[in-house]
């Protein structure tokens, strides 16, 4: 494609201005500490993004803790993969399936309480660099756990430990406490077209 020299020059000037803005923001970001991230919303990718961070953390030699609060009725590709690294990843599947499958509130509460005991231990361990609390938002949304207690344990974690909380319906208090919040938006999903959940894509 033949571009005019004037167009090339305008592009270069725009990119120079953009680089200056980005460089300035990078220079101003001097605080270094563990961050709390929340992945919520109705779209696909909340847990997938969190497990991508697990892979990234492992690449940096960090130890990781994973607690799954709701999922657990069926095996997943991420569980099968990360269990290959027992020294680096402490992986705990504590749920018994989605809430509409269990249909037993008291049992769900008991499972969530047991899961939080495991999570609290990971959050107190200075050797663990990243903790993934998968579908914790669901447990909080249904009142299986007390938000104040959960936030207290998260905020008392080691200074450089990162935490990722996933699940729909993030509570306002969780959003307020978080450093980074991402709302996954559902634009289109294969399931609505009658396509079954696919291995390697959904699980």
Swiss-Prot record:
Q: Which Pfam families match?
A: Co_AT_N (PF12557), CobA_CobO_BtuR (PF02572)
Entry EC number(s)? 2.5.1.17
Q: Reply yes or no: does the keyword Magnesium apply.
A: no
Sorted alphabetically, the Gene Ontology cellular component annotations on this record are:
cytoplasm
GO BP annotations, alphabetical order:
cobalamin biosynthetic process; porphyrin-containing compound biosynthetic process
* Compartment list: Cytoplasm
Its top-level enzyme class, in one word, is transferase
Q: In which pathway does it act?
A: Cofactor biosynthesis; adenosylcobalamin biosynthesis; adenosylcobalamin from cob(II)yrinate a,c-diamide: step 2/7
Q: This protein's superkingdom?
A: Bacteria
What cofactor is this protein dependent on? Answer: Mn(2+)
Q: Where is this region: Disordered?
A: 1-21
User: What keywords appear on the UniProt entry?
Assistant: ATP-binding, Cobalamin biosynthesis, Cytoplasm, Manganese, Nucleotide-binding, Porphyrin biosynthesis, Transferase
The record lists the catalysed reaction(s) as: 2 cob(II)yrinate a,c diamide + reduced [electron-transfer flavoprotein] + 2 ATP = 2 adenosylcob(III)yrinate a,c-diamide + 2 triphosphate + oxidized [electron-transfer flavoprotein] + 3 H(+); 2 cob(II)alamin + reduced [electron-transfer flavoprotein] + 2 ATP = 2 adenosylcob(III)alamin + 2 triphosphate + oxidized [electron-transfer flavoprotein] + 3 H(+)
Q: Which InterPro entries match?
A: CblAdoTrfase_CobA, Co_AT_N_dom, P-loop_NTPase
In which residues is ATP bound? 41-47
The similarity comment for this entry is:
Belongs to the Cob(I)alamin adenosyltransferase family.
Subunit structure of this chain's protein: Monomer.
Its function? Answer: Required for both de novo synthesis of the corrin ring for the assimilation of exogenous corrinoids. Participates in the adenosylation of a variety of incomplete and complete corrinoids.
Question: What is the name of the protein in this document?
Answer: Corrinoid adenosyltransferase
Which lineage? Answer: Bacteria, Pseudomonadati, Pseudomonadota, Gammaproteobacteria, Pseudomonadales
Q: Which gene encodes it?
A: cobO
């Amino acid at each position: 494609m033949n571009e005019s020299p004037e167009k090339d020059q305008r592009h270069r000037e725009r990119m120079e201005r953009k680089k200056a803005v980005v460089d300035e923001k990078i220079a101003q970001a001097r605080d270094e500490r563990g961050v709390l991230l929340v992945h919520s919303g109705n779209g696909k990718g909340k847990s997938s993004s969190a497990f991508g961070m697990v892979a990234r953390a492992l690449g940096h030699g960090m130890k990781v803790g994973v607690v799954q609060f709701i999922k657990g009725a069926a095996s997943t590709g991420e569980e099968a993969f990360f269990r290959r690294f027992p020294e680096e990843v402490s992986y705990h599947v504590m749920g018994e399936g989605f809430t509409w499958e269990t249909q037993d509130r008291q049992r769900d509460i008991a499972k969530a309480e047991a899961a939080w005991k495991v999570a609290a231990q990971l959050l107190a361990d200075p050797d663990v660099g990243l903790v993934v609390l998968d579908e914790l938002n669901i447990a909080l949304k249904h009142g299986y756990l007390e938000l104040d207690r959960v936030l207290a344990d998260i905020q008392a974690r080691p200074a450089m430990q990162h935490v990722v909380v996933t699940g729909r319906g993030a509570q306002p208090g969780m959003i307020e406490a978080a450093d980074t919040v991402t709302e996954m938006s559902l634009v289109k999903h294969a399931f609505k077209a009658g396509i079954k959940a696919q291995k390697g894509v959904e699980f």
